[in-house]
Amino acid sequence: MISDILAPGLRVVFCGINPGKSSAHTGFHFAHPGNRFWKVIHQAGFTDRQLRPEEELQLLDTRCGITMLVERPTVQASEVALQELRSGGRELVRKIEEYQPQALAVLGKQAFELAFNQRGAKWGKQAITIGTTQVWVLPNPSGLNRATLDKLVAAYRELDDALATRGQ
């Protein structure tokens, strides 16, 4: 079982789609060696150094957290059913209302659209909020995503810069 990394007063909560088999096996978020999450958030400015999956709790020191839309592990996110995403979206809203981070970053456009019943989402900041929490859609850092490391870092840096502009 993989646990959420949540606390009050966070700058951002990164929301993955669901755990992969490597994460399920190790118990840590974004644990597959091909997943670029830890490298991306470091290069985008969220962490001072590149954390390893087993150091995930240190994210709280940077006022960042992690949750996921669906708890069930799969080999690929495409194996997650629509009902699971919709249910996960409702649960995610509940968590965000409870913890009230400055921003929620959903990692994947299609997952965001399905979980929140939105159409035509663009990358970046969304028009919707959850209370006062900004909602962002960022590319998924999975190695299966064809986005280059530079494009991932640029997308995540936009969020880091926006939070810095808000003094967060």
Swiss-Prot record:
Keywords linked to the UniProt accession: Cytoplasm, DNA damage, DNA excision, DNA repair, DNA-binding, Hydrolase
Superkingdom: Bacteria
Primary location recorded for the protein, binned into one broad class: cytoplasm
GO molecular-function terms, A-Z: DNA binding; pyrimidine-specific mismatch base pair DNA N-glycosylase activity; uracil DNA N-glycosylase activity
One term under GO cellular component: cytoplasm
Record field: transmembrane: none
Pfam families: UDG
Enzyme's top EC category: hydrolase
Translocase in keyword set: no
Gene Ontology biological process terms, A to Z: base-excision repair, AP site formation
Function recorded in the entry: Excises ethenocytosine and uracil, which can arise by alkylation or deamination of cytosine, respectively, from the corresponding mispairs with guanine in ds-DNA. It is capable of hydrolyzing the carbon-nitrogen bond between the sugar-phosphate backbone of the DNA and the mispaired base. The complementary strand guanine functions in substrate recognition. Required for DNA damage lesion repair in stationary-phase cells.
Subunit structure: Binds DNA as a monomer.
Family label: Belongs to the uracil-DNA glycosylase (UDG) superfamily. TDG/mug family.
Protein name, entry field: G/U mismatch-specific DNA glycosylase
Protein's organism: Klebsiella pneumoniae (strain 342)
